[in-house]
Amino acid sequence: MKKWLSFAALASPLVGSALEVKPWLGNEWEFQFDAAYTYSRYPNVQNGHPALRSSSNDQLLTFDLGAVVLTPKLDFQLEAEFSDTPRQKWGVRSTAAQVRYQWLDDIPGDDFVSLTTGANVRLVARHSLHDVSCPYHSDVNVEVNASVGKEWSRRTSWSWRTFAFGGVGIANHGSPWDRCCAVFEAHFTGSQVIKVFGEGYFGYGDKTRVNIDRFKGWGFIAHRSLDIGAGYRYIFDLWGELELSYACRVIAKSYPQGEQTIQLTYNLPFSFF
């Protein structure tokens, strides 16, 4: 069971998200390397001024390194993002670190559900804060979060599972935010996984109008968004897994609207011990 779980333990299930949100952890002292390419496109920013002259075509490269260390209940993750948009050429967008602790684990059967809580900090490049395609509130962003889920097993592997995630955060400038997601995954033929998901992101600033030319992050904007999507993942046993995901934005207020996103992710587990 743990073997199959570890291949997907540190790759985020959501398009546009990278830091882990699942409640399940991988194997102790096993590292997980993730590389993701994301392409997204949106025609405009709801309540944005001035209107975009053309659709925003954005690219994002994300690299993550995570590991379960010290105890089977604790994992760490480091991340770096590189972006290219009409408002900035290829360069570092942000770096982040996250730590999580698992309080309940349903895989051995001792607990009914799995429950994991965590905290992360993200540092954002100043030039990216002036880009409306960058989703962060300010240059230093801190979040606490929790994830709860349950899986149903068949023989030596899980057959399907579902989980929900919620996080609240604050930056060094602006108002707090919260985000949430719900995910359902089904495991077929030992090596194939499909998923469907929904993700919400909400900011509580006092402004509803987005000044695109003088943008300084989302911390002062009362923004709302809801994305839905699906993905397919193929597991190559010892050589990790490859996943293709798609998401579309169905609700946007004071935020990029009509965004469509495609993400290709490769996950490779490895160990030095």
Model-based region annotation:
Residues 35-43, 69-73, 80-86, 103, ...:
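Transmembrane beta-strands of outer-membrane beta-barrel pores
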Residues 33-35, 63-69, 97-101, 144-150, ...:
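Residues on the lipid-exposed face of transmembrane beta-strands in outer-membrane beta-barrel proteins
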Residues 19-29, 70-73, 87-89, 104-115, ...:
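Short loop/turn motifs that connect adjacent beta-strands in outer-membrane beta-barrel proteins
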Residues 42-52, 191-273:
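Outer membrane beta-barrel transmembrane domains
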Residues 33-37, 76-78, 99, 115-119, ...:
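Membrane-embedded beta-strand positions of outer-membrane beta-barrel proteins
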